[in-house]
From Swiss-Prot:
Organism of origin: Glaesserella parasuis serovar 5 (strain SH0165)
EC code(s) of this entry: 2.3.1.47
GO terms classed as biological process: biotin biosynthetic process
Subunit-level organization: Homodimer.
Encoding gene, per UniProt annotation: bioF
Binding site for substrate: R18, H130, T352
Name recorded for this polypeptide: Putative 8-amino-7-oxononanoate synthase
Keywords: Biotin biosynthesis, Pyridoxal phosphate, Transferase
NCBIfam families referenced in this protein's UniProt entry, alphabetically: bioF
Family matches, as Pfam families: Aminotran_1_2
Amino acid sequence: MNKFTQHLQQLAEIGQKRQLPDIEHQGKFVIARDLTMLNLSSNDYLGLANDAQQVERFLQSIGKNQPLTSSSSRLLTGNFPIYQDFETLLAQRFQRESALLFNSGYHANIGILPAVADKQTLILADKLAHASLIDGIRLSGADFFRYKHNDYLHLEQLLQTHSERYQQVIIVTESVFSMDGDIADLQQLVALKKRYTNVLLYVDEAHAIGVYGQQGLGMAEVFDCIQEIDFLVGTFGKALASMGAYLVCDSEIREYLINTMRPLIFSTALPPINVAWTYFLFEQLPQFTEKRHHLEKLSQILRTEVTKRSEFPLLSETCIVPYILGENQQAVEKADYLQKQGYYCLPIRPPTVPKGTARLRFSLTADLTEQDIMGLISCL
């Protein structure tokens, strides 16, 4: 038995072996195993991916001006005008000096941190920060500690103990945490940062951009601290129904990354037509207020009912609603039951979440109805 077979067998024995699902999409439904199920596992938070009118309007407006491929890195011949137009729009909306686009949120996080951190840098990351952030931290080679989740007293203790030994310290967090749906207190993080002259703040808004804030600019808008975050990162593959990621930052940081960030320098750029689609939707973000309010209403209903039924505390304040069951097999069996009832939800198991907290992760979208949510609740 080779090491690959052995490892796969071990994963199967502990209920952690994964496989790619064989599914088809029909609007807010998915079809798998001959079952038609309401999709409760999508990150299409505003329901834009299924909005045929938006797609039709975009296709009518785009003409033949945007190629289907960039065929090059942006530093060679892949820097099409739509990239610069979109970065200008991002900077204007966030009222920051500049913005920079990337191929994905993963590319952003594994590229920015290694570019800006070195042996004279200390990184302090939230214990539940996304895997892409942790990978970026490890690739950077910088010293790092992971502070207890959303525990700013622990973070402050680490700053007091270690900050003077380093040229710079970077605090790294998500704004909305992807597995628990809870929120970082960005105001408190900004206040901590301001107590030190060598501290920078890196915030990943992947699950917040588009969904929160009056203009849809994420939790940094909600907490009114956009100007205080040194590296404000977000993605387009969730609420914005597209692909890619962005950073809004000072112009000096943008220029530095163009010269040092390997995933940017050595990757073929996103297709211009893809960037044009993202621009088209991002430009409309302030107009999606009704979608955001509807999504929050649905989320509140489900959070209330999950709290009544779960033995575990529910920390979520967002449209990501975990139903923690504990053991892997419990989560697998409950997911299978709900799928048979017509609700496509998936078990989330270690190492994605801590041991003993296997769960179903309900990811709600604005194209769901209150009736959809009540039907799900009746099966919990």
